[in-house]
């Protein structure tokens, strides 16, 4: 599990337990909603209309975030370099290699070790001394799924809570119901030995009458419900909040209304409240939002090492239609040794058609698309990771963040394009980046119609890489392909 793991061996069991936990929580028609996602499975389990299937399968940021948390089996050993910008450049910059150096409460140390974790991750080494400092320091941090950021801010909240004071002291905003529950599970596990510290969820369906005396010290919720609890129902006194966490900021600003609601909540907080913001990306819109909501922050950025195409051999095959593409795919399968493969389609219709064709020809195939619930997607990815299926056919929902060591081939059954029908360079990079990982060699095949050839040439020029034409009828040529 992504945000639970700090570097121990507890991951696989926790992943399985959380998969089970969420499958009991999420109703088929209550899957993550509102963030660009337009379709979910019908209530009877049937698939949606063909009109929906013709649309590009657009990535749902919140669903992807939850999916990555569910499928992570260990802490990500990030190759990113951590860049720290202090609000006071003259102050000494501290980092830690052990949890003991943080001088935590004994019950917190016990909770950390009971979870099976032993040392801070790379980003935690720099972030935790700032988050636990006295007086409190504000922080804006770029942190991707799997780097231990949820555990870090949960530790900060638990460290500042006074169990004897029975009112909300820490407030955490998450973009969805499911992500709020996920964070709460981390609080419950890490705070296992923190006697009399409790969590409350300000999420849809948790109806609390106006005037109720809320005695739980940590509140986790979505912006709309938290806003209602604070200003309409008067359940939370924001002037008493000591730690304010805004998680998944990039997802927040992608959701209509959430950024304004978050800012309104933040403006009612006391000046001495510690404010922490986390985002997987630092695009201009995210950065502008972060600067509006977090005053005088320290900043932690990940200087990302670019995905490289140097260890991926790229080919293209000219085809007339999708049946042509499928025949070319069969020829490639017949000519080279394949471990596991991921095949990307631009629409659900093509993904479903290809799945049926391959299954009828006896291939072990699984289909992954945005209409599935997050739990269904996590189950499919785990089966693929376990080798129960050798081919994963997917839309853009799987373009990034899913690492399977056995993947040796990526096929673009359709080239990724944007709404202007121009090449989507970033998606292309992340698609073929599913192979050639962990220092291994990989192969990428692009199945394209003749009229799409100019798009492929733009991709080749953009990445300054070589994409060779392959004759799918020349089996001798195919058999000579090496990783």
UniProtKB/Swiss-Prot annotation:
Domain of life: Eukaryota
Post-translational modification: Phosphorylated on threonine residues. The phosphorylated form is found in the cytoplasm but not in the nucleus.
Outcome reported for the amino acid change (mutating residue 70 to A): Enhances nuclear expression
Any GO BP annotation: mRNA export from nucleus
Motif (DEAD box): 247-250
Motif Nuclear export signal per record, residues: 61-74
Pfam families: DEAD, Helicase_C
CDD domains associated with the record: SF2_C_DEAD (cd18787)
Catalytic activity: ATP + H2O = ADP + phosphate + H(+)
Keyword Ribosomal protein: no
Upregulation: By gonadotropin in Leydig cells. Inhibited by flutamine.
SMART domains: DEXDc, HELICc
Keywords: ATP-binding, Cytoplasm, Developmental protein, Differentiation, Helicase, Hydrolase, mRNA transport, Nucleotide-binding, Nucleus, Phosphoprotein, RNA-binding, Spermatogenesis, Translation regulation, Transport
Uppermost EC category: hydrolase
Coiled-coil region(s): none
Tissue expression notes: Isoform 1 is expressed in germ cells. Isoform 2 is highly expressed in Leydig cells and weakly expressed in the pituitary and hypothalamus. Isoform 3 is weakly expressed only in germ cells.
Residue sites binding ATP per the record: 143-150
Family affiliation: Belongs to the DEAD box helicase family.
Described purpose of this protein according to its UniProt entry: ATP-dependent RNA helicase. Required for mRNA export and translation regulation during spermatid development.
Name this protein carries in UniProt: ATP-dependent RNA helicase DDX25
Source organism per UniProt: Rattus norvegicus (Rat)
Gene label: Ddx25
């Amino acid at each position: 599990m992504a945000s639970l793991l700090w570097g121990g061996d507890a991951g696989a069991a926790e992943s399985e337990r959380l998969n089970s936990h969420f499958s009991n929580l999420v109703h088929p028609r209550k899957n993550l909603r509102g963030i660009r996602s337009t379709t979910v499975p019908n209530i009877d389990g049937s698939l949606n209309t063909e009109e929906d299937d013709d649309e590009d399968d657009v990535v749902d940021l919140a669903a992807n975030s939850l999916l990555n948390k569910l499928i992570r089996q260990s802490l990500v050993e990030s190759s990113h370099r951590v860049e720290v910008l202090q609000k006071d450049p003259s102050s000494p910059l501290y980092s830690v290699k052990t949890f003991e150096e943080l001088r935590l409460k004994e019950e917190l140390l016990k909770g950390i070790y009971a979870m099976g974790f032993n040392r801070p991750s790379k980003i935690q080494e720099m972030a935790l001394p700032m988050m636990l400092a006295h007086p409190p320091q504000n922080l804006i941090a770029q942190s991707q799924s799997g780097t231990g950021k949820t555990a870090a801010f949960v530790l900060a909240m638990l460290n500042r809570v006074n169990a004897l004071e029975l009112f909300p002291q820490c407030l955490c905003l998450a973009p969805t119901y499911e992500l709020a529950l996920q964070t709460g599970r981390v609080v419950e596990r890490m705070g296992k030995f923190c006697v009399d510290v409790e969590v409350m969820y300000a999420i849809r369906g948790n109806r609390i009458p106006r005037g109720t005396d809320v005695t739980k010290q940590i509140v986790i919720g979505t912006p709309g419900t938290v806003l209602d609890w604070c200003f309409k129902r008067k359940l939370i006194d924001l002037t008493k909040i000591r730690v304010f966490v805004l998680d998944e900021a990039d997802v927040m600003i992608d959701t209509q209304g959430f950024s304004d609601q978050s800012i309104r909540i933040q403006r009612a907080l006391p000046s001495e409240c510690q404010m922490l913001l986390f985002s997987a990306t630092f695009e201009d819109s995210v950065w502008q939002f972060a600067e509006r909501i977090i005053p005088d922050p320290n900043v932690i950025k990940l200087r990302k090492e670019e995905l490289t195409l140097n260890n991926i051999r790229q080919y293209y095959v000219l085809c007339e239609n999708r049946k042509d593409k499928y025949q070319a795919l069969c020829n490639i399968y017949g000519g080279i040794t394949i471990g596991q493969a991921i095949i990307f389609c631009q629409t659900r219709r093509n993904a479903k058609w290809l799945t049926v064709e391959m299954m009828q020809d006896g291939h072990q195939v699984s289909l992954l698309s945005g209409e599935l619930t997050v739990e269904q997607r996590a189950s499919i990815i785990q089966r693929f990771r376990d080798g129960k299926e050798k081919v994963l056919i997917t839309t853009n929902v799987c373009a990034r963040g899913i690492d399977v060591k056995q993947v040796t081939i990526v096929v673009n059954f359709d080239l990724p394009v944007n709404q202007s029908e121009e090449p989507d360079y970033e998606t292309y990079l992340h698609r073929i980046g599913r192979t050639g990982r962990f220092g291994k060699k990989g192969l990428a095949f692009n199945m394209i119609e003749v009229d799409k050839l100019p798009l492929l040439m733009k991709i080749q020029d953009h990445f300054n890489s070589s994409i060779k034409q392959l004759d799918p009828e020349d089996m001798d040529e195919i058999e000579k392909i090496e990783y």
